[in-house]
Amino acid sequence: MRLWSGSSIWLERRPVTAEVASSSLVRIAILKENMTSQIALIFFNLLIVGVIFTHLLLTTPVVFKSLDEASAANFLRSIFPRYYLLIIILSLPVLLILFLYEPSGTLKWLAANVSFHAVLGFLLIPLTNAAKDRGWDKVFSFAHGMSVYCTIVILALSLIQFFLYIG
């Protein structure tokens, strides 16, 4: 019996066989798994973006306006390791999901680069602090510039991933 017809689509009512039912259940299970993975990927990338925006727009300006130079330096020395560790922790589920479920190399490359730049930013912290303490202005400028570069790359790649997942 025909239920509806359009210009090129015909829907028919057919009895459900065991084969059709089992294949439909498998498709539903795969769809739920893919949807859950996609939601997790979107969630973790947006968390990374949120951490960066919070740090750039709220934390840093307030620190320099509210604290003297020595207190600001102490605060930033304690916050930056936590900042990069949080980004590393948030990037790991993205890597895990993509390496388990995603055949595309592009998404894996993007996620690996987010994690790599977070680790690089974390590893630059001792160099940045030592350069500042010893008055090595060129080394400090380079290390600080690399830290800013890492943050920009992480932000850009996380936003790219977000738009790829929702697109």
Q: Which residues make up each language-model segment?
A:
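Short, positively charged low-complexity motifs
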Residues: 1, 7-9, 22
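Short, Lys/Arg-enriched N-terminal segments with co-localized hydrophobic residues
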Residues: 23-34
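Basic polycationic patches enriched in arginine
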Residues: 2, 13-14, 27
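Residues marking helix boundaries in flexible regions
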Residues: 10, 17, 29-31, 167
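Polytopic transmembrane helical bundles with strong interfacial aromatic enrichment
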Residues: 34-167
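Intrinsic disorder/low-complexity segments enriched in polar/charged and small flexible residues
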Residues: 6-8, 12, 138
